[in-house]
């Protein structure tokens, strides 16, 4: 669902950012690799010029770079100019990572950010969602989808999981 959408958004935005940079950021670099690396390679295959698993970077045919990063090491994201950014599981990140490091990296190119994740109570991700939901700021938009909206999941499997899993 949301990770596959994020991969498509990264590829499309990178293709529109001639020689530019786009980031996918997860709570840790290991999570970024586990969640996104193979999906990007699969979906982007026709437009990938090269990939480097050691530094988790994919170079596209137009010279743009997709980098996978971990929010637990924010110093690795300083000093870059970004056209697009995905923050996955934003509720599990410190808000300063976006506010102090990544938001400024988007400014000079008027870049966009996509925040995705699983709700984790009322925290900075919740506040951002509520802000976007108000529609007072045209630069923010909120969407809410459940597992039932995911065409890749069988609804009966979701029902079985709901019955067998505890809620916390």
For each feature predicted by the language model, list its residue ranges.
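Phosphate/NTP-binding elements of NTP-utilizing enzymes
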Residues: 1-168
């Amino acid at each position: 669902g949301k990770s596959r959408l994020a991969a498509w958004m990264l590829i499309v935005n990178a293709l529109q950012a001639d020689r530019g940079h786009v980031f996918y950021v997860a709570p840790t670099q290991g999570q970024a690799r586990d969640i996104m690396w193979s999906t990007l390679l699969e979906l982007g295959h026709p437009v990938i010029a090269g990939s480097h698993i050691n530094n988790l970077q994919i170079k596209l045919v137009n010279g743009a770079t997709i980098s996978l990063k971990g929010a637990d090491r924010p110093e690795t994201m300083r000093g870059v100019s970004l056209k697009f950014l995905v923050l996955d599981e934003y509720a599990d990140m410190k808000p300063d990572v976006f506010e102090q490091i990544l938001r400024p990296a988007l400014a000079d190119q008027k870049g966009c950010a996509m925040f995705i994740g699983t709700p984790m109570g009322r925290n900075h991700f919740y506040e951002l969602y509520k802000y976007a939901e108000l529609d007072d700021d045209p630069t923010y938009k909120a969407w809410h989808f459940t597992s039932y909206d995911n065409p890749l999941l069988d609804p009966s499997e979701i029902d079985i999981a709901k019955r067998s899993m505890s809620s916390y």
